[in-house]
Amino acid sequence: MSYQITINNNTTSNVQNIVIADPNLASLGENVVFSDSQGPLSSLYVYDGVWVVKLRSPLSPGQSITITASSGTPNIDPTIALYYNNGSSYSNLTLVGSPTVSIVQDFGGYAISAYASGDFFLVASPTGFTPSSSRLLVVDRWATTPTSLDAVGLRLYADTNDWFGVVRKYINGAQNVSIEQKISGTYSVVNEIDISQFAAFTDPLVMYLSINGSTANVKVYKQGSNIGTVSGNYSTTPYGNPSMAGYGTVDKHYANFIVLPYEPDPQVTVTPISSPSPTPTPTPTPTPTPTYDITYVVFDVTPSPTPTPTLTSTPTPTPTPTYDITYVIFDVTPSPTPTPTPTPTPTPTPTPTSTTSSNI
């Protein structure tokens, strides 16, 4: 099974690293090879149906390219989502496709964050970069697993050299989420959002951070539904060591962030990912019912023979014979009454006469 994916760069920038999210790819599992006309491309598995694919060369504005996704041995490049390509800047990860799956993946302790510049998503390592983002979408792997711990955090780190702010999720008996922000080296609770509507925390939470001047707006989403917004100031003071060293074992867990595409790029388009069209099964042609051209009918008192159809079809039922009655003669002469034979009268038997004699 293979899928054809056509990418159209309708932007004004070059794009090379593409996030392809489509449930059709989930049927291929992790063993997916992406290829262009010259052969396999480098890729990075994110989650079922979601991959980061590095094009062989940047796709210029107005250009299109068709790649193929099929079962096979992938050409995994673990640096795609971690390091920049040209040594001076990070390549944009342009989201294409139809992201309908929740992306939750542990990258083995690597600290991965994402930010958007314009309509592009960027994935980078925490080795230091200057953010210019207004949007940030990440999700923590633990957010999908119920736990007995009091704090099972989700943090967004931010400053000019490292990350954008600090957000932490607390779970307590009241089922509240505490949004915390790193300000001047200390934590301060900006607001609390009641998430009692969440079902046992088995669904991932998405923290959406918007930077506007000195205000950080944090929105919490569950399956795309906004349940609240908090605001507060953020600090541009570098937070900790950009290499994440010394953060402690718990904070290393917090570094297991991945991209959760929420706002598809409206400018870079992709054709629907689909398999080749199957050959349609021909519909059998029905056998036509034979028709007859009747030019004349001869009526005779002899039953008509059954016509033999000229085409092979359902046999025509034998018609009931018809007769042409030409005339009927009625004889009005009464039939003679037969003369009855007279019954002979029986001759009566004579009564015998007795003679009496007397002797005096």
Curated annotation (Swiss-Prot):
Keywords: Repeat. Residues 269-289, 332-360 are annotated as: Disordered. Residues 275-289, 335-351 have a biased composition (Pro residues). The keyword Signal does not apply. The keyword Magnesium does not apply. Sequence repeats lie at residues 292-301, 323-332. Thr-Pro(N) repeats lie at residues 270-291, 302-322, 333-353. It comes from the Viruses. Residues 278-353 are annotated as: 3 Thr-Pro repeats regions and two near identical repeats. This is Viral protein TPX.
